[in-house]
Amino acid sequence: NLELEIATLHSQIRSIEAPESMVQSLRSEIAMLREQLSRATAENERNGTTVPLGPRHQHHRSMASDVPAADVLEFHEDVLDERRGADVPPEEIIDLLEDEAQLDEDVLHGLIEYLKIPLPSLQNPPGPKEVLFPSHLISLVTNEMWKYGLVHESERFLANVMQTIQQHVMDFHGDDAIIPGIFWLSNVHEILSFVCIAESDMLQGVGPGLDGSARDFEWGDYERLVTIVKHDLDSLEYNIYHTWMQQSKKLLNKMVVPALVESQSLPGFITNDSGGRLLNRLLAGNHAPTYTMDDILALLNKTWKCLKSYYVEPSVTQQVITELLKMIGVTSFNDLLMRRNFCSWKRAMQIQYNITRLEEWCKSHDMPEGSLQLEHLLQATKLLQLKKATMSDIDIIYDVCWMLTPTQIQKLISHYHVADYENPISPEILKAVASRVVPNDRNDHLLLPPEVDEAGPYELPAPREVTGIET
């Protein structure tokens, strides 16, 4: 058990004449074991149970699952600094790098599967080291492998790392996918940036073995590996983006219509129309969730906070928010277009108020251009509020609603739900609107292309400047 290991290490220090670096390494290991023992004891006391401690390699897993990222980072940096300062023989380092089981335990489990990700925060954001340390440690291990010519070992190591990250991100669903998805998107891009540096060096003839410490290896194998790993990391970054964005869009798709089209927050403009969805409501019963604009804004806020806290590039942040806003705009516009009873000026007032809340969110987050994704819906609400009594009124509608096609305008006007105190739209007006529709005009479509749950094309940002790793 742990106590026996501590006693054994103490006896080793007393009984051997070792270099000071080795003694310090043993003392560090004792301190780590004591910390694990105290953690396990405290955990057992809280749970009121006694958990048997297994072989030593299992301790890394339990520690990683309980310790926050900052603590893991501090421990690993201490160990790395200590090893860099110590005169460790290359053979010893190579033995560590060739220990596949221990590497898998420390990296695949400790750094990926059981890592406690730092929580996003705009007021007290985690530092870059706290966020990106998994990628830095993975890059450091890779760099050491290449330094000593362990090309095939690094290929196996990186393949397992990429597979584990992808599977880990895919294990999360709904709202739970946002934090790990964005966290690992940023870390994978950091690893990719490290590989891009290695590729640049490789093209200049710089690579493993220049200092004579590397084992024999084929330079062609190294070139092939760097090329393949770069391509695979590129694909992994897209897959991560695709996975968590798909989960976010699925969740958002459930919210859009109830929150943006159906909810009525403005007093004095409440309507009792059913919108032709009475049958659907009866079939769904009371189990259908009710969403409000607060739910949509909460999803946008969480996504924004993660993108900023985990140091994702501004170009990616803009891409993410734009894609989510586009889904909101397209889904709500198409829904409104097909609802006869919702095409009233009171409903238009309610929807316009909800749009205003999204526009204010975009402005407060320095993305005023994001509201362009809502322009079709906004112009539809304006159309429903404008007069439709004379031909000059119709001309004004076509000027104001310049983004809408003639077919969309005809649909909204023909569906317009006249209030009791309003005059019906005259047949002459309806005929004039219909005459503007040109048959077989390919540019004149009714519905906007629907936004599916799948993420759109991902534009890979430029490689970052990676510092602190010797390449």
Residue ranges and their predicted role:
Residues 52-352:
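Extended cytosolic scaffolds built from alpha-helical repeats
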Residues 3-101, 107, 339, 346-471:
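Eukaryotic terminal intrinsically disordered regions
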